[in-house]
């Protein structure tokens, strides 16, 4: 079972201003306690070096550390888990490789994707999107919007599917209240944090919105 940390996830991204490590550090300083290292097309050795640094940072903050796509790397460094896209290793195969103690998340874009995934495996959470257009993702799937999430959540309830659904893709702070009202269990962010004038403050403000009862400490 995954922790309440999954309600707010940060996905690393490289920009002209910030390295992958910078982005993870700022998210952690802002109070986020779930970091997914996403380094598409990166050199394997560079990704491992980066993962080890960010994993140590996550441990210092008591945060969950997820590796995107790279199952063997997640196992090698004993990350908390792995997130798998629709074209990555099948979840069932990853579960065999990692065992039951690792968190495994899967990408879906529709309720049909959820049903197809559950035919062969049960992930710990679904990353579902995109909510809006996002420049951080290539080959973007059809945009869901609020109504798309409402429909998926309704269908999941009707089928008694109780797996956390995390909204992702172009999410900014102003959209969060209505997104949560749509029924998603959490959100994942990247660009909206990194494009802010003060990324740490932006994350801090969102953490306060998501976890009103939790005091944020550095």
What function would you assign to each model-found segment?
Residues 1-89, 97-124, 141, 147, ...:
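Conserved N-terminal beta1-alpha1 strand-loop-helix module at the mouth
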Residues 34-38, 127-135, 187-190:
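Short beta-strands and strand-loop turn motifs
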Residues 137-139:
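A short acidic, glycine-rich active-site loop
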């Amino acid at each position: 079972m995954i922790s309440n940390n999954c309600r707010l996830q940060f996905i690393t991204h490289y920009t002209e201003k910030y390295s992958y490590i910078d982005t993870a550090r700022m998210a952690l300083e802002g109070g986020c306690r779930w970091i997914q290292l996403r380094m598409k097309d990166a050199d394997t050795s560079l990704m491992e070096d980066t993962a080890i640094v960010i994993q140590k940072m996550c441990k210092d903050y008591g945060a969950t550390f997820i590796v995107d796509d790279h199952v063997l790397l997640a196992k090698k460094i004993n990350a908390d888990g792995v997130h798998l896209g629709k074209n990555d290793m099948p979840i069932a195969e990853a579960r065999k490789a990692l065992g039951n103690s690792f968190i495994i998340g899967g990408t879906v874009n529709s309720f049909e994707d959820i049903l197809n995934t559950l035919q062969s495996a049960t992930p710990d959470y679904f990353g579902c999107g995109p909510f809006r257009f996002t420049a951080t993702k290539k080959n973007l799937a059809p945009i869901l919007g609020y109504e798309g999430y409402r429909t998926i959540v309704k269908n999941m309830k009707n089928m008694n599917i109780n797996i956390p659904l995390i909204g992702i893709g172009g999410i900014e702070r102003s959209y969060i209240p209505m997104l949560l009202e749509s029924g998603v269990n959490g959100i994942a962010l990247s660009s909206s944090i990194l494009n802010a004038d003060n990324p740490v403050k932006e994350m801090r403000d969102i953490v306060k919105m998501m976890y009103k009862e939790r005091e944020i400490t550095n």
